[in-house]
From Swiss-Prot:
Signal peptide: none annotated. This is Heat-inducible transcription repressor HrcA. Pfam families: HrcA. NCBIfam families: hrcA. InterPro entries: GAF-like_dom_sf, HrcA, HrcA_C, WH-like_DNA-bd_sf, WH_DNA-bd_sf, WHTH_transcript_rep_HrcA_IDD. Belongs to the HrcA family. One of its GO terms (molecular function) is DNA binding. It comes from the Bacteria. Keywords: Repressor, Stress response, Transcription, Transcription regulation. Negative regulator of class I heat shock genes (grpE-dnaK-dnaJ and groELS operons). Prevents heat-shock induction of these operons.
Length: 350
């Protein structure tokens, strides 16, 4: 989206319109700006500036109001060229640390416990719909594997990955195996595969298991299933969601059809995960996708603010979803701090 370089007055007025609209959810008029902000120029000058901004598509006039509201283009200019970053306040920092840091201190939680706590506190602090995607696993380090017989024809395989991430898969058996046979295969797999990334295992498992003396039937089953066993979990299984109650309470979603559309989108976990994973243009590590920049039609009235977090060489993602009339500065502050805190916590739970 191309912009000309707005002059100081235009930037001031656009910034004020967005900041006021975020707070009031009401269109902003020139008289409101003149009364509440000491800009040093007249109501007439403000009207002229607003007319110029409207002509260029940064603001628009709702049919029933004399005031103006920001457009997607106006929000994008604000986010890219006006918005400033500040630190999160101490109370919010403390709340984040108390919720997700304690799991690391106690050493009692799993990665899922940490991510569930993270998405809940993210929703509470942002007062928006919040999501966490667990890290992609291709670059994750495999630690160990175990197998549990569920019946004579079914077996659960449990993969332990770095930082307490766990993946489980139920496999159908075409042969009967004893516990002793399973133990032999498990020992061999752990000896030969531990310390490799899942991607390395998928590429080289046949070579790495050649010449072993364990049960060939079970070994061959593992080799044939390597593409599933050592692959990514489906994206919808990596998704944690919280804060639906906050987004449905926003004025933008008071109409029943808008609420139904929103709830339908939230319940589609695959689409929700892809929305966050594919959210738009990036500023540093923070990504902000506004309105029609989103890949799903149902999200054209939303903004998605997301940030990566890191666990060793794995990457996950945090996201805040809300109306375009969002407190962008606060969302960015929360996500920046949460991403750093989550990275530190998960990296410390080995």
């Amino acid at each position: 989206m191309g912009f000309r370089d707005l002059n100081l007055r235009e930037r001031q007025v656009l910034g004020i319109i967005i900041q006021a609209y975020v707070v009031t959810a009401a269109p902003v008029g020139s008289r409101y700006i003149a009364r509440n902000y000491n800009l040093g120029f007249s109501d007439a000058t403000i009207r002229n500036v607003m007319a110029e901004l409207e002509d260029e598509g940064y603001i628009s006039q709702p049919h029933t109001s004399a005031g103006r509201i920001p457009t997607d283009k106006g929000y994008r200019y604000y986010v890219d060229l006006i918005m400033t970053f500040q630190s999160l306040d101490d109370n919010e920092k403390k709340r984040i640390e108390e919720n997700i840091g304690q799991i690391s201190i106690d050493r009692k939680g799993t990665s899922s416990d940490v991510l569930l706590s993270a998405v809940k506190v993210l929703g509470t602090i942002s007062r928006q719909l919040s999501v966490v995607l667990s890290p992609t696993l291709s670059n994750a380090i495999f630690e160990k594997l175990d197998m549990v017989l569920l019946s004579s024809t079914r077996m659960m395989v449990i993969l332990s990955i770095q930082s307490l991430f766990v993946k489980t898969i139920v496999m159908e058996l075409d042969l009967e195996v004893s516990r002793q046979t399973i133990d032999g295969v498990v020992d061999m797999l752990n000896q030969r595969l531990s310390g490799l990334t899942l991607a390395e295992i998928r590429r080289s498992i046949t070579r790495r298991l050649s010449g072993c003396s364990c049960d060939s039937g079970l070994k061959n089953l593992i080799v044939r299933s390597a593409g599933t066993l050592f692959d990514e979990s489906p994206i919808f299984e990596r998704l944690y969601i919280s804060g639906t109650e906050y987004i449905v309470d926003q004025p933008e979603f008071k109409q029943p059809d808008k609420v139904r559309e929103l709830i339908t989108m939230i319940e589609d976990k695959f689409s929700m995960a892809k929305l966050v994973e594919n959210s738009g243009p990036s500023r540093m590590d923070i990504t902000i996708s506004i309105g029609k920049e989103n890949c799903e039609r149902q999200a054209e009235d939303l903004t998605i603010v997301s940030a990566p977090y890191y666990v060793g060489n794995m990457v996950g993602k945090l996201g805040i979803l809300g109306p375009k009339r969002m407190d962008y500065e606060h969302a960015v502050r929360v996500l920046n701090y949460m991403a750093d805190s989550l990275s530190t916590t998960l990296s410390g739970v080995n």
